[in-house]
Amino acid sequence: MSYKPFNIVVILLFFIGVLLVFFKLISIWLLVIVVLAYLFFLLLISTNVQWNFFVKAYNNNHTVTNGEIALTFDDGPVENTLEILALLKKYNAKASFFCIGKQIKENPEIFQKILQEGHLVGNHTFSHTRKMGFLRTQQVIEEINRCNKIAFEVGGINLKTFRPPFGIINPKVERALISTGHQVIGWNLRSYDGILNSKNFILKRIIKNIKPGDVILLHDNNLQTVEILEQLLLFLQNNNYRSVRVDNLFQLHAYS
């Protein structure tokens, strides 16, 4: 069931609940609990792109058996990206960078270097605003288009893949993506490198859970990610894994 008919059913059930409360057939507290549960459900489906509730997202590829995985980096390009690029080159690995438009504008040479070294770049909106979940449809479209515009000006490419900031997908983002035609790239293995401070814990968490076809979420604006990455690349090399671009993992067109 898509969101719109689902929401209509919920609204009808809510009014039925109000009537039941009015005629004292159920407690008002039961209705309050149900409403709160629904709001919590909305929060979950809006912040978990992997659930594919509003849009189809490419989170992992279960059909992969040859050890291919995808390393993905969000929130660059930044100075730290250069160290990440050096490590990827050292271990002959390819990755995907979901770039913020304003960071491309501030660091055009780094953005160009990502492309020159054969990695994928995708759209991560222009500003990566914390208000992403509250933007109107047209505002989301503008965020996506502005990022695409600066990427084209700097790199001469038209981005077709998109990763939502904070993994937020709601009906407004859904409508924006229908308008822009971007393909959504999610993840199924989150490193939490932007939240946790223990490099060993983060690395062990990835290594413990990794399997062929996985999409791993990292951040190139986090200093500890460089140290984590080298150890991770060593593990991949020693255990017959190979990092590829997400367009190759899913057989997608990255640019148009």
Feature names for model-found ranges:
Residues 1-71, 86-96, 208-256:
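Terminal accessory/targeting
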Residues 34, 78-82, 198-202:
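Short, acidic/polar
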Residues 42-132, 142-146, 150, 158, ...:
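Active-site beta->alpha N-cap acidic-glycine motif
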Residues 73-75, 99-101, 123-125, 164-166, ...:
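A cross-domain feature marking catalytic cores of carbohydrate-active enzymes
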Residues 75-79, 98-107, 131-138, 163-169, ...:
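Acidic-and-aromatic substrate-binding clefts and catalytic sites of carbohydrate-active enzymes
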Residues 84, 107-110, 173, 198, ...:
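Residues at alpha-helix caps and immediate loop-helix transition turns in enzyme cores, especially N-
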Residues 85-99, 119-120, 137-168, 175, ...:
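CE4/NodB-like, metal-dependent polysaccharide N-deacetylase domain
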Residues 174-209, 241-253:
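His/Asp/Glu-enriched short active-site or ligand-binding loop at hydrolase and phosphoryl-transfer sites
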